[in-house]
């Protein structure tokens, strides 16, 4: 009866009724979407006003390749801090650094060439990688598998080929480390990635191909002094998980 009243008020049918079934009309689907959003906002307002998140919000940023491996660690941390809301963002390290500088994130795990001292870090050696079965380095122009603009390693990769006088093109671009790893192994492009990404189907390039050694980057952890009280505890868990010192 309430649904009938609502249909009369809107002047539109919300359900298609037959003797066998009742289905939402297009207007009914739209209204359902709005109703869900209203309920979600109501629950959010309730949580904010009743103090369920009385320990605040901890905003964590990390590279995409660490998002899945750390889910269990983050879930355990959340269970240990039920009144702290944990918001997690994954993305390119350069973007995470920028968000941290704008104070949009409290704690970040990033790959970088050091610009300021982190709370903890460890080196990440880099390798030139190509496909063992389908070498991209032998093509002209040489296809490259790279992160998007502002992504790590991209400038090093392009500059090295420029210095060799080799023509190159972007053959594969992705913000996903896993995707770049697979693409280079399949022959879609030469890439420069952490040594930990090397697969059995990769060929390691180097001096024989005229490619220079590249200084290691570092995996670094930062958090701000004014972050929620539980931030150092999460930082210690991430530090242990990633082998940072």
Where are these regions (language model features)?
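A late-sequence structural motif
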Residues: 69, 210-245
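Interdomain hinge and pocket-entrance segments immediately C-terminal to HTH DNA-binding domains
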Residues: 49-66, 80-84, 141-142
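Short beta-strand-to-loop elements that line the ligand-binding cleft
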Residues: 85-91, 167-176
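Beta-alpha-beta core module
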Residues: 117-119, 185-226
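Secondary-structure junction motif
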Residues: 136, 143-165, 231
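A short LG(V/I)-centered, amphipathic sequence patch enriched
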Residues: 5-24
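Short beta-strand-centered segments that line the small-molecule binding cleft or hinge
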Residues: 72-76, 93-130, 205
């Amino acid at each position: 009866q309430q649904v009938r009243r609502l249909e009369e008020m809107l002047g539109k049918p919300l359900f298609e009724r037959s003797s066998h079934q009742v289905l939402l009309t297009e207007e009914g689907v739209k209204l359902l979407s709005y109703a869900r959003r209203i309920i979600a906002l109501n629950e959010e307002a309730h949580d904010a006003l009743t103090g369920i998140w009385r320990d605040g919000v901890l905003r964590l940023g990390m590279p995409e390749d660490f998002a899945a491996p750390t889910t269990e660690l983050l879930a355990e941390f959340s269970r240990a801090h039920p009144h702290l809301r944990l918001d997690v963002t994954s993305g390119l390290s350069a973007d995470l650094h920028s968000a941290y500088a704008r104070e949009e994130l409290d704690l970040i795990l990033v790959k970088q060439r050091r610009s300021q001292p982190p709370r903890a870090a460890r080196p990440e050696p880099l390798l030139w990688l190509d496909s063992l079965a389908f070498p991209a380095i032998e093509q002209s122009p040489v296809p490259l598998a790279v992160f998007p603009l502002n992504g790590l390693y991209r400038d090093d990769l392009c500059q090295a080929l420029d210095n060799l006088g080799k023509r190159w093109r972007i053959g594969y671009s992705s913000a996903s480390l896993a995707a770049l790893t697979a693409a280079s192994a399949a022959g879609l492009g030469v890439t420069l990635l952490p040594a930990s990404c090397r697969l059995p189907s990769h060929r390691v390039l180097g001096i024989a191909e005229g490619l220079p050694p590249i200084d290691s980057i570092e995996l670094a952890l930062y958090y701000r002094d004014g972050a929620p009280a539980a931030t150092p505890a999460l930082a210690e868990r991430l530090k242990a998980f990633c082998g940072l010192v």
